[in-house]
Amino acid sequence: MESLSEVSVQFSQLSMFPFFDMAHYLASVMSAREQAGALDIASHSPMASWFSAMLHCFGGGILSSILLAEPPVGILANTTNIMLASAIWYMVYYFPYDLFYNCFFFLPIRLIAAGMKEVTRTWKILSGITHAHSHYKDAWLVMITIGWARGAGGGLISNFEQLVRGVWKPESNEFLKMSYPVKVTLIGAVLFTLQHGHYLPISRHNLMFIYTMFLVSIKVTMMLTHSAGSPFLPLETPLHRILFGLRQNQAEVRESPSSSGAKGKPSKKTLDKDSGEQSNKKDK
């Protein structure tokens, strides 16, 4: 048990720059390139393609800055990270013969990059919660919101990113149909906020280690099995019925008598047919 605690302490002291940040930028830009029409945008409007890729990479920082009334352009002050993400964007889109993209499209490399990106998600959630706490002391909702925005900002602002590429899909709003990364980030923001308020009997470094291992294992499993659904679905369905299905059940109960009554009544077509047969009998 002590060895596990030591491992979690050392894990919590990992530096995200440069390797984990590079993996995050690589996975984000690869995801941006695989969007419909992304290559056409890159060939006709490189500036729009670059801005779209930067939203994928730094969307969490931009969204959290907007929510805290801070200048969103402050992300540009980190010149080193911007240049690193821009270099990866250029090589993914414009490297001769797509050698860079095809090299990192190799599944084992993509698994490593995706796993490292999930590690950065934990650090982003924590940094968002800490940053929100410095502005609003022990404001739970603010801390959860900023941690959620910092960790899943790229998904939460996906509609704006689509507008940059000239696409408008309001039905793809994350608030209407949350994707797995957005859901699991919200859960992480709640857990780390509770831990920050000492309402969870677990140390921060242990929670970081357990949560990150969960993220990495689920992400790798989903990529290996080519699963696009949420692993939380078996829990979401019964919970939704229990918490939000009451009105739906009442509506079904109200509709059932009318439907059963309708079954007992003869249709208009049947009545017309019967009346026609009776008139024919009279003529005979």
UniProtKB/Swiss-Prot annotation:
Please list the GO biological process terms of this entry.
regulation of release of sequestered calcium ion into cytosol
- Taken from the record's topology, the Cytoplasmic segments are 33-44, 100-102, 158-178, 226-284
The subcellular localization recorded is: Endoplasmic reticulum membrane
Q: Which reaction does it catalyse?
A: K(+)(in) = K(+)(out)
Q: Which Pfam families match?
A: TRIC (PF05197)
Q: Where is this region: Disordered?
A: 250-284
Recorded GO CC terms: endoplasmic reticulum; endoplasmic reticulum membrane
Amino acids binding a 1,2-diacyl-sn-glycero-3-phospho-(1D-myo-inositol-4,5-bisphosphate): 117, 121
Could you tell me which InterPro entries the record lists for this protein? TRIC_channel
Membrane topology label: Multi-pass membrane protein
Known activity regulation? Channel activity is activated by increased cytosolic Ca(2+) levels and blocked by luminal high Ca(2+) levels.
In this chain, composition skew of type Basic and acidic residues spans: 269-284
State whether it acts alone or in a complex, and with which partners, per the record: Homotrimer; conformation seems to be controled by binding to diacylglycerol (DAG).
| Similarity remark | Belongs to the TMEM38 family.
**Name of the protein:** Trimeric intracellular cation channel type B-B
- What organism is this sequence from? Xenopus laevis
